[in-house]
Amino acid sequence: MRIKAQVAMVMHLDKCIGCHTCSVTCKNTWTNRPGTEYMWFNNVETRPGPGYPKQWEDTDRFKGGWELKNGKLKLKAGGPITKLANIFYNPDMATMEDYYEPWTYDYDNLIHSPKSENLPVARPKSMITGKFMDKPEWGSNWDDDLAGGSEIVPLDPNVQELQDHISMEYEKTFMMYLPRICEHCLNPSCVASCPSGALYKRDEDGIVLVDQDACRGWRFCMSGCPYHKVYYNWNTHKAEKCNFCYPRTEAGLPTICSETCVGRIRYIGVVLYDADKVKDAASVEDPQDLYEAQLGCFLDPFDPEIQDKAREAGINDAWIEAAQDSPVYKMAIKWKIALPLHPEYRTMPMVWYVPPLSPIMNHITNEDELNTDGYIPAVDQMRIPMEYLASILSAGDTEVIRKVLLKLTAMRVFMRGKTVGGVDEFKQSELVREANTSPEEIEDMARLLGVAKYVERYVIPTGRREMDDDLDYQQGACSLEDLAPREGAAATFAYERGML
C-alpha cells in the first residue's frame, strides 16, 4: 500500500446558473497574457451541445486518454514510436476551427472617428493576426443556453447515439450547465503523453502541473488529454493548463473559480488513496466497472491503520483531519452522489459532479400534487435524460445514475415533509428505503448541498513543504543568479561541513 493525498473537487450541477463568473475570474487571473487569448482553464458548457473545443468528447478523432490493448493499458494515441514518427506534426490535435480565433474590436475608431452622418463601427479584429475579420464564427460559449438549436445540439457526441429518440421538444425539457476545469487525474494521460516529461503530478497534493523550463512545445499533451484542458501558448511556445490555483490551495484557500462561484456549486477537499491500486483500477475490462474500481482506490481516513500508514508516508495530522472533514469524501465516497466525468477515458479524474435533478423533476407536471410513490417510476421513465447523464458521468451505466437520482429525490421529498409537510410518512419511508439511505444521512446531505458554510465547503489544509528544503541554508539567499549561494548536492555537502 502506497498512500497519497489528493486535493479534489465536486461540483453540484443543480446549483449552477450558467453565469460564467468562474470563467471570467479564472481568465483574468491566469490567462490574460498574449498567447493565452483562446485559453479557458475554466469554461461552462451548455448541454446538450458540442462543448469547447468542439466535440472534445470524440476520442476516436482526437485519440485522448487510455485504452486496453491485449489487457494492458496503452495510450489511445500510441506509444513512443508512434509519437516519434509524428514528432513534428501531431495529426490528432484540435485545430483553430475547433477552438476559435479570439478577437477584439476596433474601439479606437469609435473614439477618434471624424464627424460623419453615419455612426462609426467597431470592426472585429483578430487578436492573433491583428487583421480585421469579416465576422466571428465561434467562441467558447457560442452555443450558450442552447443557442443554435437544431444545428448545434446534434454536434454533441453524447446525443448522437440518441438521435432516434430526440426531437426539438427535448431541448425544452432538458438543459444543463457543465462547468469544466482540469481533472487532475490519478492516472493522467497528458503526463504520459509528453515526450519531454514536462508535465508532472505533484506528490504532496496530486495537482498536475507543467514545468515551463522542460516543455519543448511538442503539444502531444493537448491531444493526449481527453478533456482538452491543456493549451498551447503560441507566444511562449509552451504548454499551459489549469493549476488548481496552487498558490491559493497551498495557503489553505479555495481556487479562484470556487471563491467567486455565484451558485456556490463547488466543494474542495482532500481524499486519501492507494497509489498501488490505480493501475489495476484503470485496467478493468468493462468501462462501466471503472467507477467502482476508482472508488476502490480511496481509503477510509477514519481507519486507525490507514492513519498510521499515512503518517509513515509523510502525511501529517492536519491533512488526515482534513480528509476526515472533506466534503469530497462525503459526497463521492460515503454518500456516492457525485460521479466522475467520463470514467471510460481511464484517467481516473478527480473533479466529480452531482448530477442535476431538475431536468428529471421538471418533466413531471403538477409536481406538488404528486404522491411519493410517483417519484420512483418518474425517475425510471425518464430514460433519455438518464441515458444522456449516464453517457457523461457513468460510462453509459444508467443504474448508477438511477441510484443517485433516487437518493437526491428522497432528500427532496424528506426535507419537504419536514419543512412544509403534506407528505405521507409511510410513503416517505418507502422512498428512503428504495434510495438506500437514512433520515440522518439525508439531513447531512441537505445541509452540505444546501446551506453549508464556507469552511464546510472548502476544507483545504495548508501546503506540506516544511521538510522539502533546508530552510536554514536558504535564509538570506539572494534571487540574483550571480550572487545566490550555490545549489544542489555539492552545495549541501559543503554547507554540512562548514565550507560555506
Predicted regions and their residues:
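Non-ligating segments of multi-cofactor redox enzymes
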Residues: M1-L500
